[in-house]
Amino acid sequence: LGTLGFLLAAPSRAQEAGPRWCRLGTTPAVSGYEQQLVEEIRSQLGGLPAKTDNMGNLLVTIGSGSPQRLIVTPLDEPGYVVSGITPDGYLRVQRLPQAAPNAVFDLLHAAQPVTISTRKGQQVSGVVAGLSVHLQPARLNGPKMAHPDEMYVDIGASSREEVRAAGVDLLDPISLNSQAHPLANSQLTAPAVGDRFGCIALVNFLNNLERNKAQVSGTLTVAFITEQWAGGRGLDRILHEVTADEMIYVGRLAPPRASPNAAPATPVSVPTAFKPGEGILLGVSDEAAPLGDYAAELQSAADAANVKIHAELAATPRIGGYAAQTPFPKKFAYLGVPILFPVTPAETLSMADVGSITDLLYRYLVGTKSLTGARGSIVSGGSAAPILETLTEAYGASGHEEAVRKVVSEFLPHGAKTETDASGDLILRLGTAAGGSAKKIVFVAHMDEIGYQVHSVEPDGRLLVDVLGGGYTEYFLGHAVLVHKADGTREAGVLELPAGWDKPGFEWPHGPRNMDDPVHVYLGTRSAEETQKLGIKVGDWITIPKKYHPLYGTRANARSFDDRVGCTALLEAVKSLGLSLPGRDVTFVWSTEEEVGLKGAAAVAEKMAKDGHPADFVFAIDTFVSSDSPLESQRFADAEIGKGFVVRAIDNSNIAPREYVDRVVQLARDNGIPVQFGVTGGGNDGAVFTRYGAVDIPLSWPLRYAHSAAEVIDTRDVDALSKIVTVLAKNW
């Protein structure tokens, strides 16, 4: 696997106890704002001498005399900077670099969690706003979310003052909330990993030098440079600071220029026939020409280190600006690695290739084999999370709700007598009036979330998948996924992007869809046999990774608040009610497969009717998809987060009688519970009870950016929802 083959345990940015290499790969470092990553590198260099210039470049110099050798790698990733703050607390952004790296760069940030790095070194969580798919059939000419003019970042604030109270201000950089995921065959997917593999390789190289007390001939300077995406300014400075006889640049191979007089290429990875794991790429200006003397020296060192190296057509690293191009040393080499899905949230490379760069450099500069590091590990911990956080972070796509059902059962009061029906619904009946004259009341919240399911395994090892639920493909393709296997373990993969995504002028077909176009998942495997060896089978299910992020004040972000908030509200209500409700007939249902046709709730409704116990009233506890967003028209679905629960009077599946809407509103006001009511899109579980005589009165909480990784709630609305369920269970 090479020196870095062990680097495959991958926690998120927030897990500071994670492997050292992972912190190098996931620490935010938007162009011009690389200071945090520089400090992380410095902390990993031990006693090696390191200095930082006023461009932010970090230099480590070892030895003295001639020859003067320079090894360079970039630090920065493309991202955004806060360019404005709206009166209602949203952040406006400017892209860095100002020209988009590819046609889908902005779009792939839509409805995604992000991190804002403040002046005081805080990492503030936020999300990029996205359209809610449930509302779009009733909209006209919605935004495409494909340009900074249509981008807003939501940190949970309601005003400029709250934004600044959170520590966020103009010029603060914004980057994706990164998480690295190991794939098969030593591959890794993570945002910006194509900008960081050089940092990982060179820090490991320097640590190997120090551990081995190795000597290099002459003077060696290793430079970690800033602003590769902003015209190569850090590189330009280094070339004036260090007079080098020879230079090796480790980073993305830039595409060849269209002509000798064309502008320097941006550092987007070159298309290559080589795949991750097949070796190092050596950038050349003419693939057909014999290697020059310096490249031949590196080829010889690669052979001695048993490292594969392939010539690949590429331009020299970019240096922009208005002055003449700074010349590179005559002895110059450009090293990269094959990268899939470059400059997307799911770009993928092989850590074995990264390790090979360390091995090659060590062999070339020291003359011996490098020291292989020890295996890394994930450090996990933390106290038990509250109900909502625990439920939200449990995975359970439609038809695969076992883990969620287990969490619900564990949070129910001791002694709760539940049953699980053939559809997987969890049912709890309370009260002493079953079969009597009391009105039969049902509260139902669904446990499932949207996702995918393995349809078949392709001969090349990729998965062809079916959709479970609906949403915007823009929020999922080009991002990492988790494949949940029958034995309870997971494998990471990447949802592949549409054909042509990396071509100039590509435009994603816009509009709400049920994601039913053919979609593939890349796992890093090379054949169906390799995929089968991972234990993946037809029928295994797939989700986007997720994590609960507190935002400003009482707001929070996570995927699958729809409908884990509803599940939480029912649990909180049961805790408040206790397990005895004299004179009442109340059933609580945590249902399955709502996202694929209300199937679990339909099974419960049918069984109750067949047993002669049909519901009189059903309160479906589910999302009110809200237009409380700068991207949405407020013509309908206008319920503000933080202003209370919502009576979902009208949606696509039900119209609640006004007399009952008004009655719920009055009960809420009588009990001091903040309440709203309105019209939204989507369907609800209660709709399948109406055929058996029930009245459906859906109760909700307002949700921003539904069916995405950017979902945002106000936890005060969850409290209001659980309180109204408690009141209704006692008094309806």
Give the positions of each predicted feature.
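N-terminal hydrophobic/helix-forming segments and targeting peptides
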Residues: 5-732
